[in-house]
Amino acid sequence: MPSRRAPKVVQAREPRAACRAARPKRALLDVNVLIALLDTDHIHHARAAAWLSDNIGGGWASCAITQNACVRIMSQPGYPNALPTARVAERLREATETAAHAFVPGDVSLLASRHFDTEQLLGHRQVTDAYLLGLAAANDLRFATFDGAMPSRVVRETRPAYLVVL
């Protein structure tokens, strides 16, 4: 049984060269990975669960955007395995109460030119992906996603180690 504890919050910090040289361990999970983990009938559930099992030592993270999107998507009537909103929120809350989880505050702005080159955004569909990758990079986290078309050139601080495509 997972250990229960108060939610851990990742504290944003200034990049340090020594810290940046090492591969970040904790991973901010994209909403598509969260959904695959929570929905045992999801086509990518086994792949997401295997990846998390192999990487749980570093821990995992979520943020308000990924949590809200997970609840919204999994509870909408068009979702194949839709559940009531309260049930999805309960399952996600249980997952985030484990010792391996940390909450990442969304304290990085897409408008901050220090973090993002918005001239590289090719369209509206890249905005959230670029933001989440930038949030991960700003907090020295990996960003785990199923999305192979990640707009990494938008994020100024990113390196290949920050992006994990499952």
State what each model feature region is.
Residues M1-A22, V108-L122, A130-L166:
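Acidic, PIN/NYN-like endoribonuclease modules and their adjacent C-terminal/linker elements
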Residues M1-S62, M74-E90, E157-T158:
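Short, well-structured N-terminal submotif of metal-dependent ribonuclease cores
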Residues L34, Q67-C70, M150-P151:
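A generic structural signal for short hydrophobic patches within well-formed alpha-helices
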Residues T40, A64-N68, E90-L121:
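Acidic catalytic patch
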Residues G59, A100-A102, A161-Y162:
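Conserved beta-strand segments of alpha/beta enzyme cores
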Residues V71-S75, A137:
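Short, amphipathic alpha-helical segments that act as regulatory/interfacial helices
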